[in-house]
Amino acid sequence: MATERYNPRDAEPRWQQKWNEDKVFETDNSDPREKYYVLEMFPYPSGRIHMGHVRNYAMGDVVARYKRARGYNVLHPMGWDAFGMPAENAAMERGVHPASWTYQNIASMKAQLKAMGLSLDWSREFATCDVDYYQHQQHLFLDFLEKGLVYRKQSKVNWDPVDNTVLANEQVIDGRGWRSGALVEQRELTQWFFKITDFSQELLDALDTLDQWPEKVRLMQKNWIGRSEGLTVRWEIVPETAPAGETEITVYTTRPDTLFGASFLAIAADHPLAKDAAAKNVEIEAFCEECRRAGTSLAALETAEKKGLDTGIRVRHPLDPSWELPVYIANFVLMDYGTGAIFGCPSGDQRDLDFARKYGLPVVPVVMPTDGDAASFSVGDTAYDGEGVMINSRFLDGKTTEEAFNIVADRLSAASLGNAPQGQRMINFRLRDWGISRQRYWGCPIPVIHCDACGVVPVPKKDLPVKLPEDVTFDQPGNPLDRHPTWRHVACPNCGKDARRETDTMDTFVDSSWYFTRFTAPWEAKPTDPEAANRWLPVDQYIGGIEHAILHLLYSRFFTRAMRETGHVAATEPFKGLFTQGMVVHETYSRGAGASREWVAPADIRIEEIDGKRRAFLLASDEEVAIGSIEKMSKSKKNVVDPDDIIASYGADTARFFVLSDSPPERDVIWSEAGVEGAHRFTQRLWRLISEAADCLSAVAPAPASEGEALTVSQAAHKTLKAVQNDYDKLWFNKAVARIYELVNALAAPLTRVAAGEGDIAYRAAVRDAAEILIQLVAPMTPHLAEECWAALGNAGLLARTDWPRYDETLVMENDVVLPVQINGKKRAELTISRDADQNAVTNAVLDLDAVKNALNGQAPKKIIVVPQRIVNIVV
């Protein structure tokens, strides 16, 4: 019989309301079932969700719904990473308070997320800008301070003189602020730091336990922590070139084996010797200032032209005092790594080689590959930085690099310069303590008070929270807290004298470093309920972009350890499983070229295929526009698709199904209208097949078949159930989709037969069993459609509360097996035969194979060994 088309605009809000009324997704901490905590990285409330959000949250929702059906007590919360600069920028540009802008955006985005039908526990929702959240963050800060995990020191920072704020190294581009474009200044400011370096070795070692994390992320963190074993080497300054009072330069190196290849030393622009030289030389002063203005991120250092300036200082080689080397100030040496000084071995380091070629410094090969020829080995345009055998290194020649390392380390450790060893073995880490001070209003206030008499005084916990004042103005750059007439003035908690509040706020990465813990008991009057936190942590499955591989994920690992040290949690790691999904990308379209190029939105064009080539035209004018590359969706290039438009046109289930179906979840998915329409056709087809057969199916109870014409129906359904269950366990969503398509195709004819009134009761019962399995398989991805189909079959209760089906082992076994056939130990053929075939049947079938007949060439086999359902061996 004909049925109405599935109408998502009617069905989706209706089922969302029922889930909400029934509180299906609210989690009870006292539920005794095994727990499963699934969490997607919570969003910044920018105002609108984008298709990347849809994909991220759809993946998490599949996991949550699937695990809930499998009988777990699932925690699947949502909140808002709500502090940060965009809100202050909006305040300056639009004259709206950051809080108003933020909470309006949260309301809009929450409505969008609810329209997606996500199985979220909204009762645990919070925003990090809620006073009730950040007061607990202030409590944690004070606990860390008491434990010695927080300290304050003078630190050089990148200062944007237009925005009047500190910039991270990554925010300095070609010496200018990323937002204002102003030339960045280097300033000494007193900053607050978290002692993440206390856990350097533990953070590194524990990476080996994170076997459910992508190897790429673990490697990125390993490199960021940057443990190295090396040597500090003290180089004597040639007295007649030494600045007053200076006698040596200390260098940290991981390659002391290459010392005989040294041709220069390089120091950072902020090294004490560089500062001394700059004070006496205008040219050096200007060069040091140029170095400071350049970006100090790794990317900036690697791509910038290598520059240096000879200081005139000379040092004596530690292994040969008669050998003098020049000391340069170089733009690629940083004061906050090692000692702020390096020795350059051009033959063994590409950066040093480029530098040496530029300034005419010697290049002496000192390491060659183990199969190299010392007489002919040379260095051209590429340095050799591998392991190998020492050459041109005097007493080290012929040694391996490892042997040479130890020989040099032992020799310099035994040698003296002044009254101390000239060399000392050392373990170094690239990881630096986390500076959390930000000169901004819209962040968590740091709960300390500055008193002229008492110094730095922590705010007593009984006086928390330190609330942000609401009566602030953004009519000028800088931190409004600095110029607030009353908020910063406060009595000292110790002596009662006039004092000042700290006006810096915390880095917003602090907010996201423990939110997953707060979700376990967001109503608790303390930062955590240890019992709840210890029950739920670590998060079983965390989902988010790989762009957070370093900072957020590393800071969260530190925070969990710091909270362990202060008694708030027992867990050591925050996230047991990590999945980094790919982006949603789209073609770009543009008109014009160069500076006059104008990007065009996908909604404003139509695509035609003319003479076998895809071409794009403006809807408004039929003007042809250029089809560009496929790139990450971005507002700047207008290649964005609004989820609201897709949901309004096709429904949330179609959007969810498409972003899960078109490519492996760890890869980018290319957005295409054809793909979305294909997903929509699937939802309509599934509804039509189920709804047309619903009256007949609802009259019988589901029961799989064990024989007869319905057996193939039951086998197809139960085999698919087993396979998709494995796919969901491994987050292979696209594979699950492919199998579901196959099952729909397999069930189309049986469902059509039942709809036409054909088939006996056993056949209809088997088809109903298969149809219910199909509905339950699609439910995690298309939950509204699944509920509609489930109800159409006459099932009472919500599918969202229904247990996952179990496959019948007898139905998933293959009837045939493929046996390899070996003759005298060599595989010669394969035999496909019934799983139940006895030994005689297998033997006769093997001897009848052409490949076996040819191999035997008329000979009778001495022995045939049949290992049931495994292998056949023939001995000739």
UniProtKB/Swiss-Prot annotation:
This protein's record includes keyword Manganese: no
Magnesium in keyword set: no
Motif ('HIGH' region): 43-53
EC number: 6.1.1.4
GO MF term set: aminoacyl-tRNA deacylase activity; ATP binding; leucine-tRNA ligase activity
Swiss-Prot/TrEMBL keywords: Aminoacyl-tRNA synthetase, ATP-binding, Cytoplasm, Ligase, Nucleotide-binding, Protein biosynthesis
Residues given in the record as ATP binding sites: K635
One of the protein's GO biological processes: leucyl-tRNA aminoacylation
Motif ('KMSKS' region): 632-636
Protein name: Leucine--tRNA ligase
Species for this entry: Rhizobium etli (strain ATCC 51251 / DSM 11541 / JCM 21823 / NBRC 15573 / CFN 42)
Record lineage: Bacteria, Pseudomonadati, Pseudomonadota, Alphaproteobacteria, Hyphomicrobiales
